């Protein structure tokens, strides 16, 4: 059920991140080298999740692994326990909550019309449903943290925190962001571009689907204009 995926990606994963923030306040600060393995593990996990995204053929699995990779960055920056790091983690969790939920919603919109989640069988929707293509483009741009969205603010704060803590982490961060951009572009091109494989008539999008997407992306755009609300 798509509602379960949306709630899991938007709320439950982020509650886990919030729990880690609360738990870290009871632990000693990272002046010792005790937390280095956890930070490296979180960043390496983010890269592996991103690489897994690149080889996915199932649209829903791709979006799910995308959520995992973003949480890797969040966990890495929470462990460092700096004000900028916590602000960046909160910003990215809230922004990615909206984005991943919107992507799951769009995947379901495609699934209802094609009855498949295989990427190669969901091509050519820009010819059939141009408004949905616009929503896909916006959601993917937010997923790759395009300025001036809240995703960009969060990732910038996370990058600054990790770079100040250890400059070599920029290699892993940069690689992670590069792969994120690659699979987001791959997801957009696979679902929207190319010839349509459908021979049957496709049902047009309904107002409720556009309303659902508006309620995901417009609050995120508004929060992006005033990020002090969340950080």
From Swiss-Prot:
Name used for this protein in its record:
NADH-ubiquinone oxidoreductase chain 4
Write out the GO biological process terms: ATP synthesis coupled electron transport; electron transport coupled proton transport
Quote one Gene Ontology molecular function term: ubiquinone binding
What organism is recorded for this protein? Answer: Lachesis muta muta (Bushmaster)
Q: What is its EC number?
A: 7.1.1.2
Q: From the Swiss-Prot or TrEMBL record, state where the protein is found.
A: Mitochondrion membrane
Q: Does the UniProt entry include the keyword NAD?
A: yes
Indicate yes or no for the key word Transmembrane. Answer: yes
Q: Which Pfam families is this protein grouped with?
A: Proton_antipo_M (PF00361)
EC class of this enzyme? translocase
Species lineage, top-down?
Eukaryota, Metazoa, Chordata, Craniata, Vertebrata
């Amino acid at each position: 059920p798509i509602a379960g995926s949306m709630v899991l990606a938007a709320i439950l994963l982020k509650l886990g991140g919030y729990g880690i923030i609360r738990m870290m306040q009871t632990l000693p600060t990272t002046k010792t080298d005790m937390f280095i393995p956890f930070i490296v593990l979180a960043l390496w996990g983010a890269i592996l999740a991103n690489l897994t995204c690149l080889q996915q053929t199932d649209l829903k699995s791709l979006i799910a692994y995308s959520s995992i990779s973003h949480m890797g960055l969040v966990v890495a920056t929470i462990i460092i326990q700096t004000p900028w790091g916590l602000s960046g983690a909160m910003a990215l969790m809230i922004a990615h909550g909206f984005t991943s939920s919107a992507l799951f919603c769009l995947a379901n919109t495609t699934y209802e019309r094609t009855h498949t989640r295989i990427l190669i069988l969901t091509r050519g929707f820009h010819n059939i449903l141009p408004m949905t293509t616009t929503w896909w483009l916006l959601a993917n741009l937010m997923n790759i943290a395009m300025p001036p969205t809240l995703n960009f603010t969060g990732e910038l704060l996370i990058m600054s925190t990790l770079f100040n803590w250890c400059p070599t982490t920029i290699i892993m961060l940069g690689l992670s962001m590069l792969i994120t951009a690659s699979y987001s572009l791959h997801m957009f091109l696979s679902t929207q571009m190319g010839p349509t494989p459908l021979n049957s008539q496709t049902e047009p999008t309904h107002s409720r689907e556009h309303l659902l997407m508006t309620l995901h992306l417009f609050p995120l755009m508004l929060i992006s204009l005033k990020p002090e609300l969340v950080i």
